[in-house]
Amino acid sequence: IEEDLIEEVIRVIGFDKLPLSAPLAPVSARVRPEAQRGSHALRRAVAALDYQETINFSFVEERWEAELAGNLEPIRLLNPIAAPLSVMRSSLLGSLVQVLRHNLARRATRVRVFELGRVFRRDASVQTSEQTVVGIDQPLKVAGLAWGPVEPLQWGARERAVDFFDVKADVEALLAPRVATFVAAEHPAMHPGRCARVELDGRTVGFVGELHPRWKQGYELPAGQGAPVLFELDVPALLARPVPAYQPVARQQAVNRDIALIVGEAAGHDAVIGSLLAADTGGLLRSARLFDVYRPAPGAAGFQPGER
């Protein structure tokens, strides 16, 4: 490496011949843009949501890649440090599931962990540079796993297991003040009916969902307790944040109104709220929030023609 070559040259010339005064050079401070936060700030934000950071090997078991990442052609190591750790990871989720298993073997009753690191995927468009290798994409990801009670042991509330919506709220907090859209989706590691794709400005930035029942059983997790909930997000999407812009306070007092809509069962939350916000209200509508859902009782006749 460069430093070793410099050391050898100095040894030949003689250390006693080096000038005693430090070299002078102009120094210019590098100021991070206000609309960008660093990875350490992101780590602190995840830790503030009650997750503990873990650091795992970048080489993992081939089984994890096939089952939890759907990657049947992972990048193989020519000289792995151990026979099971034979491929490079393309997802952080396998390592977090293994961390959960490690803690459960030591009788942990509540586990909330995360990792921020690089994953490795084949990409023919990547060229060799100072930080890249030809054909290999190395994006930064952050992933988290929550299992067990929502709150630590305490007396003020009944114990409740963490669920999809708890972790979804954590993802929303990490992306705030930007508002994400959650679209029902499928992921190799996650429950097909309890998984969502996270989108920002129409672009997919990650996934959140419960661990698939098949993998919960396959990785020997407790059967009588809830499934762990996981998320994995692109780090660049989390580092960007809009700069607050001043808006004058309205001279007129805000008015709240309730509105009832009749929609089909297939209509989701985002479709309902999106249609309201897209309506031509002349700038009078600032926000909309869904607070109640009513469904007729099973067997009821429903709405009559004159009741709509």
What annotation goes with each model-predicted range?
Residues 1-111, 116:
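Extended, well-folded interaction surfaces typified by the phenylalanyl-tRNA synthetase beta subunit core
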Residues 12-28, 73-78, 119-158, 248-258, ...:
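Residues forming anionic-ligand binding surfaces in small-molecule and nucleic-acid pockets
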Residues 14, 50, 117, 148, ...:
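Glycine-centered flexibility sites
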Residues 31, 35, 85, 89, ...:
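Generic alpha-helical structural element
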Residues 44, 48, 84-85, 103-107, ...:
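A general structural signal for short secondary-structure junctions and capping/turn motifs
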Residues 56, 63, 137-138, 143, ...:
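A carboxyl-terminal module marker
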Residues 69-81, 85, 133, 206-217, ...:
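Active-site loop ensemble at the mouth of alpha/beta enzyme cores that anchors a bound cofactor
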Residues 101-103, 121-122, 213, 295:
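Short beta-turn/strand-loop junction motif enriched in small, turn-promoting residues
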